[in-house]
From Swiss-Prot:
InterPro entries per UniProt: 3-IsopropMal_deHydase_lsu, Acnase/IPM_dHydase_lsu_aba_1/3, Acoase/IPM_deHydtase_lsu_aba, Aconitase_4Fe-4S_BS, Aconitase_4Fe-4S_dom, IPM_dehydratase_rel_enz, IPMI_cat
Organism whose genome encodes this protein: Mycobacterium bovis (strain ATCC BAA-935 / AF2122/97)
Record keywords: 4Fe-4S, Amino-acid biosynthesis, Branched-chain amino acid biosynthesis, Iron, Iron-sulfur, Leucine biosynthesis, Lyase, Metal-binding
Protein name: 3-isopropylmalate dehydratase large subunit
Stated family: Belongs to the aconitase/IPM isomerase family. LeuC type 1 subfamily.
């Protein structure tokens, strides 16, 4: 990334330049102003302690939003949290927000939910913003044409105290996805295919801009899914230039501009596009028409294949590190090379997370489950990304479809995306999940995770093996 030079700039460079408080001149980090700081219970306690020790207040509490998501249960939310560590973290967040004057959406609040679902649904996430959170998947907000990234606890304290962050410029990458997506192929399949192509380190040190006709055709929910998993390709952030789809999503939301302020904002937002002639450090191309439903077989998001394929054979891999990683992954996943992905049976299906816990995702799942039943021996959890999403799903009759099918329809939270709350796999259980990480033990010690789209998750729940909706016909 570069400072203003009069030369064509990428979208990321434009936002960066607009937020420089003090330039490092290329020798030191730039001091970047932060427009929105999102906070949750896991990465914030030490940051608030640091403020107390230094006798500081939160610099811009009105630009800070907190919500409870990682540790919260998704059933019996009116009861005390059973796990003492989780309970302490949630109670600590509540005390800290009360003391420092930060708005908090707690369990039972209609706006409570996963932080990366709540920000956009409230209209707080807007084009051209810099957004940070002590959470890897902050890149989700880049779907709105924002520069959004996860930060560590010490950086959380710095932003709370100063509303700025010292950062070194990133490299830029363009991921061009052109063509028409085949029926049954979703945003989740695009990002899983990309990570399989470039690897979990392919985007390291870069901000990815997703471009092309296939990206432009996606809803905001689809764009958020793709930007959410940018970090799984090693990228610092992911983004999509704002357009009419973006503006339509934002219009009328609680914190979106209105009246003359909307008109002024729109003028700025419409300038947020990569200039003709701007040069990216790296470019990658995907043919949308060639994509199909994707699923992971291993223990990182890059270890994925089309659902129609088979478990790969490590002995056919020429790279030693790749082969050794594959052998280790297959041993953990208890899979044999050559096994058709569609033959792999699951014990559980999880629909939710900041990747795929929005209303559009739930509609897709409901369409597959309508008039069908979850297979015997399969436990299916459907967890909305926020209580607002849950209320909308209930209003549309989706909750009844889920429960009629035999799925568990839960309250909002991060749930089975990660083993920090009661929703976990038992050791040896296998799960098809719409979340973003399939690391060893991610969903519970010894649990085995296959990352899939909402459509594949729903079809898998019905058949009991990894499947797409086409397999149900």
């Amino acid at each position: 990334m570069a400072l203003q030079t009069g030369e064509p700039r990428t979208l990321a460079e434009k936002i960066w330049d607009d937020h420089i408080v003090v330039s490092g001149g290329g020798c030191a980090p730039d001091l970047i102003y932060i427009d929105l700081h999102l906070v949750h219970e896991v990465t914030s306690p030490q940051a608030f302690d640091g403020l107390r020790l230094a006798g500081r207040r939160v610099r811009r509490p009105e630009l800070t939003l907190a919500t409870e998501d990682h540790n919260v249960p998704t059933v019996d939310i009116d009861q005390p949290i059973a796990d003492p560590v989780s309970r302490t973290q949630v109670e600590t967040l509540r005390r800290n927000c009360a003391e420092f004057g930060i708005r908090l959406h707690s369990m039972g609040d209609i706006e409570q939910g996963i932080v990366h679902v709540v920000g956009p649904q409230l209209g707080l996430t807007q084009p051209g913003m810099t957004i940070v959170c002590g959470d890897s998947h902050t890149s989700t907000h880049g779907a709105f044409g924002a520069l959004a990234m996860g930060i560590g606890t010490s950086e959380v304290e710095h932003v709370l105290a100063t509303q700025t962050l010292p950062l070194r410029p990133f490299k830029t990458m363009a991921v061009n996805v052109d063509g028409r997506l085949p029926d049954g192929v979703s945003a989740k399949d695009i990002i899983l295919a990309l990570i399989a192509k470039i690897g979990t380190g392919g985007g390291q040190g870069h901000v990815i801009e997703y471009r092309g006709s296939a990206i432009e055709s996606l809803s905001m929910e689809g764009r958020m899914t793709i930007c959410n998993m940018s970090i799984e390709a090693g990228a610092r952030a992911g983004m999509v230039a704002p357009d009419e789809t973006t503006y339509a999503f934002l219009r009328g939301r609680p914190h979106a501009p209105t009246g003359a302020q909307w008109d002024t904002a729109l003028v700025y937002w419409q300038r947020l596009r990569t200039d003709v002639g701007a040069v990216f450090d790296t470019e990658v191309y995907l043919d949308a028409a060639s994509l199909s439903p994707f699923v992971t077989w291993g223990t990182n998001p890059g270890q994925g294949v089309p659902l129609a394929a088979a478990v790969p054979d490590p002995q056919l891999m020429t790279d030693d590190a790749e082969r050794q990683a594959a052998e280790k992954a297959l041993a953990y996943m208890d899979l044999r090379p050559g096994t058709a992905m569609r033959e792999i049976a699951v014990d559980a299906v999880f629909v939710g997370s900041c990747t795929n816990g929005r209303i559009e995702d739930l509609r897709v799942v409901a369409e597959v489950l309508r008039g069908r039943k979850v297979a015997d021996g399969v436990r299916m959890l459907i967890v909305p990304g926020s209580m607002r999403v849950r209320a909308q799903a209930e209003a549309e009759g989706l909750g009844e479809i889920f429960t009629d099918a035999g799925a568990q329809w839960r309250q909002a939270g991060c749930s089975m995306c990660l083993g920090m709350n009661p929703d976990q796999l038992a050791s040896g259980e296998r799960c098809a999940a719409t979340s973003n990480r399939n690391f060893e033990g991610r969903q519970g010690a010894g649990g085995r995770t296959h990352l899939v789209s909402p459509a594949v998750a729903a079809a898998t729940a019905v058949r009991g093996t990894l499947s797409s909706p086409a397999d149900l016909n």
